[in-house]
Amino acid sequence: YFMDKYLNNGCVIPEDMLEENIRIDYNKLRMLIRKDKNFTHDASVIQDLVTCGFVVGELKAGFPAERICEPDNFISLLYYFGLVTIAGTYRGKTRFVIPNEVVREQVFKYLLDTYDENGLSVDVRKHDGLEEGLAYDGNWKSYFQNISDSIYLFSSQRDKQKGESFVHGFTLAMTCQNQFYRPVSEYPNQEGYADIFLLPLLDIYKDIQHSYVVELKYVKSNASEAEIEVKTHDAEKQVCKYAETEMVRLGARSTHLHRIVIVYRGVEMVVCKES
């Protein structure tokens, strides 16, 4: 689909990266999944996949429909629908990852839809305006504050959403829906994301003025101010180091690159600054 549109459009990247027919399996998947109002089964697997970049489990050849929400069964369903692929092992278990950017869009969309089904909807019109301000005016603080406000509000409604997976997962899902950027995350270790580079889609929106490297840190809700200070200092060093990588320098091109440090204590954003 991509190559066909690209070559037949004078080698210009198509605005819609996703062919509609690929959504068929995604819709089937949503029909099969039980709407879990406690937000504990299917969504938690997706949150782990988004936050850590991978999930581990055992590939099942078959299982009854009523047991779809068991983690191994749900992961197997994702595999058979092509939403994850096998990428080796981790601690003796099969390691599953998202295979490509097209599928990544579906996974993030599923996560956002699951939030919405559980009453965790966001003001789309407001967020669209903040996305525009992020890209063209450099208004990064209001953009990330809006995400933070949503996280705080939603976690107050459902205690089980509290935690690092929810904070990271929701932030990544929201940035993935930003029409002006493609979030690129690095995996320096098995513990998850270290940095997020909001790669400006300059081939589509040639007048984007700003790009961003974001270091997102998390501490528990009972963490002290000293712990937050240490996390902030670590984040500042890491975000500056990441900003100097070749991938970021080439991706940012002529835009103004911002180095953003964010620290959450529980579900409350306590640091949001430019380094």
Residue ranges and their predicted role:
Residues 2-236, 241-243, 272-275:
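Extended alpha-helical interface modules used as scaffolds for assembling large macromolecular complexes
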Residues 247-275:
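Domain-level recognition of nuclease-like catalytic cores that cleave nucleotide substrates
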